[in-house]
């Protein structure tokens, strides 16, 4: 653990406190907590598997030539019969192959699909074309039957309400079914596999097969060594005990380490209604007696920090498709953050306490896009501090600040086993920010060759790119070995005059071991090549160990 941190814009002597308060670079606590060593993080698709097999056409002698006087369209009803006249009438004016009639049926199917009717189609039934009459059958698919297995538990009533909505839609649309499937994946504590079988009868009735599993309690932990000491963030989640789509998660940081860090957080969410609206609330508390010493010339200070945060929000799903989701979140939070600096050398009884009480509102939007070989995610957020409700801060930090932040990520699959992952992040602010609102880079957060709290600032950006390759085999305990290479970098800046920024740059090589279900163990060696690490003046390579597990 590093012993001394030199800060340039600080108090020159204890007597100067009245005229020039201490303004230290701080960190957003949650940015430096242990996190999983996963490529791309939350970019991976989470929607349940849904199969919609294509309807089979009857076998025909496609090259046989026929002469038709009339083509009858049976079934359907969503489109007027006249809709198909421009497509079918030319086939009655000349001799055609049966394959041309089948092609016309496929064109009608494409029209249904292009208009979003997921399991509707047209086909040419077996017939003898007697009297020069041909027939095309339209099947407008709708949900007729649901076969469920497994344990839906307390979610049974919610699922049945959604099913009734789908059954009422004739023909069934892709938009409704995909929204349903994504909403199902967002129910806390419910895991669902679904298969939608297309209609096999002329009435268009389709069968949906569902296999559900209700998991009320899950536990997990993330360990890493990037902070200088091994640390673990333990999580326990209770999901949908009452059937209201509620979830309560408790997180705890252990062991305290040399900095005597104590962090605990409670986060609660609950679905409101059946359309995906979600209420969110959270509370966290952090306190630490930091081992680092703040050095100003001959003076040394010890720092103790305490941070308490209360938050609330409303999640609004705007667009839910299997290939694209768009969510908007309205948020509000309060922060009570204090830092106490005790003079150690010279040994004079003196201390300074800085405190900020923030009242913040904000809005953020998240877009995720999924394709067969690519996944993308992007988010943009704006937060505004309020000069109200007893808000306060120590100059030059502003309590009525405005900050804008965002991130983007993209995963690309190259072949069957290779993957590339790009990540970018930024924060911008024109104001000097309180410690709790500043951006922090280092460790897994765009600075693998550095400790996780290497660089802070009012504004900055980070970027990384990873290439990995997976070796897969069948084994219960370990079935994936994934070596990877990462290059990352970051910049931070302060808006107050005289405070230096930071430049991070590092490269890392590592390997992940996993059973692709419960755990990921990561081992990597990273070397900085920009600023020197604050705990290593020689830019020596750093060994990082991470472990994440989840039960069940």
Regions found by a protein language model. Give the residues of each.
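Outer-membrane beta-barrel initiation region
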Residues: 37-60, 64, 69, 75-78, ...
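Transmembrane beta-barrel architecture of outer-membrane proteins
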Residues: 107, 179, 231, 263, ...
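Repeated loop/turn-to-beta-strand initiation elements of outer-membrane beta-barrel proteins
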Residues: 192, 217-219, 241-248, 274-280, ...
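Transmembrane beta-strand segments that form the barrel wall of outer-membrane beta-barrel proteins
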Residues: 215-226, 234, 245-256, 264-266, ...
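Solvent-exposed loop/turn segments connecting transmembrane beta-strands
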Residues: 224-233, 253-263, 455-458, 462, ...
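Outer-membrane beta-barrel "beta-signal"
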Residues: 236, 511-513, 518-520, 539-552
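Transmembrane beta-barrel wall of Gram-negative outer-membrane proteins
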Residues: 259-367
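C-terminal outer-membrane beta-barrel translocator/porin domains of Gram-negative envelope proteins
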Residues: 340-495, 531-537, 543-550
